[in-house]
């Protein structure tokens, strides 16, 4: 495909995505592991959703939260990965103006929704381990419903201005985005307007939301750890530490990659441009692939539910 020049001053109706500028010839090979991860993420999350829906014994607050996390993972994967694979396989690099900013909105809002869901799940584990006698009265179906509304409303409303601000910019610096996906940073760099407000709002809101969630997650697991260390039975202690430890490591991976992405964007002149592009893609693949395994499949009730589901097929 012949790409337009980035010196064009004509109105922009579509953008062109350039994946891995330095490794164009490797894209077909890279598509193979990405496709496998995509299929794993979609299959694992879909299986978890179907299992929880069909198994009456799993109609409990914890599993409703797992369903919410799986739904967010599926939407994030479908927003990003099919377009990336279409570029790799069919050289379909163009993306319309509205589709690009819809992608910006979904990525910003759903990533912060996922962070907020992690925080609520950490609170759920805190109540279960630190206040077990009060669990059934605190973590109710009504609590989960209110939490889900909070997750969607807080993050959807606060991240909505990011694509709105970007879509109102004048794009006279070209059409070519040096990325596989429409991120706010890569798109707004093409504008000939001042993007200070745009970039500042995303930075402040993004890290306020993610930072507050992370602080509450760390506090929850700190109190969980204190309680677990008081458990007398070594087997029970090891089981609790193993479960909570794997949860916390997954959350740490989620936030660490976001932090690395921010650092690479700030120091982009010193870092190869393909590094943040790859991190962006992996961040939309690895957590969705691991979440149902770490949070769901390792749970005895989920395993039993999947076995029951397979018997019905």
Swiss-Prot record:
Membrane-spanning parts: 34-54, 68-88, 101-121, 147-167, 204-224, 247-267, 277-297
Ranges in the topological domain labelled Cytoplasmic: 55-67, 122-146, 225-246, 298-313
Stretches assigned to coiled coil: none
Pfam name, any one: 7tm_4
Molecular function via GO: G protein-coupled receptor activity; olfactory receptor activity
Lipid bilayer topology: Multi-pass membrane protein
Disulfide-bond pairs as recorded: 100-182
Gene Ontology cellular component annotations, sorted alphabetically: plasma membrane
Subcellular location: Cell membrane
InterPro entries xref list: GPCR_Rhodpsn, GPCR_Rhodpsn_7TM, Olfact_rcpt, OR51/52/56-like
Segments on the Extracellular side according to the record's topology features: 1-33, 89-100, 168-203, 268-276
Keyword terms of this UniProt record: Cell membrane, Disulfide bond, G-protein coupled receptor, Glycoprotein, Membrane, Olfaction, Receptor, Sensory transduction, Transducer, Transmembrane, Transmembrane helix
Glycan attachment positions: 6-7, 184, 198
Homology family: Belongs to the G-protein coupled receptor 1 family.
Record's function text: Odorant receptor.
Protein name: Olfactory receptor 56A5
Source organism: Homo sapiens (Human)
Name of the gene this protein is made from: OR56A5
